[in-house]
Design a protein with these regions (language model features):
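Glycine-rich phosphate-binding loop and adjacent beta-alpha segment
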Residues: 230-292, 330-333
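N-terminal Rossmann-fold cofactor-binding loop
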Residues: 193-196, 226, 276
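Mid-domain Rossmann-like dinucleotide-binding core that forms the NAD(H)/NADP(H) cofactor-binding site
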Residues: 137-213
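Glycine-rich beta-strand-centered segment in the early N-terminal region that forms part
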Residues: 20-34, 48-95, 134-136
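C-terminal hydrophobic helical "lid"/dimerization subdomain
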Residues: 1, 280-333
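NAD(P)H dinucleotide-binding glycine-rich loop of Rossmann-like/cofactor-binding domains
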Residues: 91-169
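A short acidic, Gly/Pro-enriched loop at the edge of an enzyme's catalytic core
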Residues: 216-223
Length: 333
């Protein structure tokens, strides 16, 4: 079978590899659509913290697929079902896992980082992490469950009030998902501070009412920072109402420092929250939104490539003009 393997330092190859053999507690799945994102670029170019990846690694952590083989028949999932799979594989025994914070598992593994990902014709996964998606859910929406769950985790933590005025900073996939998902909390306003005017079309589809490329006037109850731009983080402190919340989802870089006016934070009684990954509960909540029909993310996949065209996909990820949403590999059916 073919797998897209990263060796780090810019080296990535489409290789013929031996198909995986599953254990009784695993399933074999044929990926249908696999997204690629900025984190995959960091893996390819070795810009990610080496503690989070094991080379060589088959990339691909945003995906949906169809079940080919089930290790144990004692499951609701059947061969032929279309599924999504939690990427974080928790140990299930540490104090974080026992508390339900599986995103903070002490010894977790992760699909596409420390074990083979879904930019491949076949992938084996733990059966306990597999979730069926209904026929009404598009492949595009299903593929975005992973990044959407990252956003769900953060929004659940921030707990915006009904009628809140919200600003999303950034115009990439995470920012667009944040704008769309936060709508389920019934805010009065969702604005976006982006970098490219060409992203306006996607922002509007996500439910954004006003799109800015320069710092907007006025103040917000909740600001979701999804750009990773350190300068935006500093500016956002002064854009919050007293008692407001700043939610950090973006990554400026492991060696990037961000200056903050602590006096402004304390005097305004602000809350600064960070959110990493997703827990099992956030994943289940996101899948439930899709299966219920309350969430449709089809609009976000804008570029598709065959796995053999991986070089073109990587180039598009680095430099495709706006509007640009999710870039994905079409692998199976």
């Amino acid at each position: 079978m073919k797998s897209l393997v990263s060796f780090g330092n810019g080296k990535v190859e489409l290789l013929e590899v031996v198909p995986p053999i599953i254990e009784p507690d695993e399933m074999l799945i044929a990926p249908i659509l696999t997204g690629v994102c900025g984190t995959d670029l960091e893996i390819i170019y070795s810009k990610i913290d080496p503690a989070y990846v094991v080379y060589p690694v088959t990339i691909g952590h945003e995906w949906c697929g169809r079940v080919v083989q089930v290790g144990s028949p004692a499951t609701e999932i059947r061969v032929g079902d279309r599924v999504v799979v939690e990427g974080i594989i928790p140990c299930g025994h540490c104090y974080e896992c026992l508390a339900g914070s599986t995103n903070r598992c002490i010894t977790y593994a992760e699909i596409g980082f420390t074990r083979p990902g879904a930019a491949s014709e076949l992938i084996k996964v733990p059966s306990a992490l597999v979730h069926k998606v209904l026929d009404s859910v598009s492949n595009e929406s299903a593929t975005l469950v992973e990044p959407a769950s990252v956003v769900t985790q953060g929004i659940l933590k921030a707990a915006p009030k009904v009628g809140a005025k919200i600003l999303v900073i950034g115009d990439g996939t995470i920012a667009l998902l944040a704008a769309r998902l936060v709508r389920n909390w019934k805010p009065s306003t969702v604005h976006m501070l982006g970098m490219k005017e060409g992203q306006l079309q996607l922002a509007s589809a996500a439910g954004v009412e006003e799109f800015f490329t320069n710092t907007p006037q006025g103040k917000y109850d909740l600001i979701i920072e999804a750009s990773g731009a350190s300068s935006r983080i500093s500016e956002s402190i002064r854009q919050l109402v007293r008692g407001g919340t700043l939610l950090l989802l973006g990554f400026p870089g492991s060696d990037v420092m961000t200056p903050l006016s602590i006096d402004d934070v304390v005097n305004a009684d602000l809350s600064i929250l960070a959110s990493f990954g997703y827990s099992r509960s956030a994943w289940k909540a996101t899948v439930a939104l899709l299966n219920s029909g309350e969430l449709d993310l089809t609009f976000l996949v804008t570029h598709r490539f065959a796995l053999e065209k991986f070089a073109e996909a990587i180039h598009a990820l680095e430099s495709a003009p706006a509007p640009r949403g999710k870039i994905a590999f079409e692998i199976g059916q």
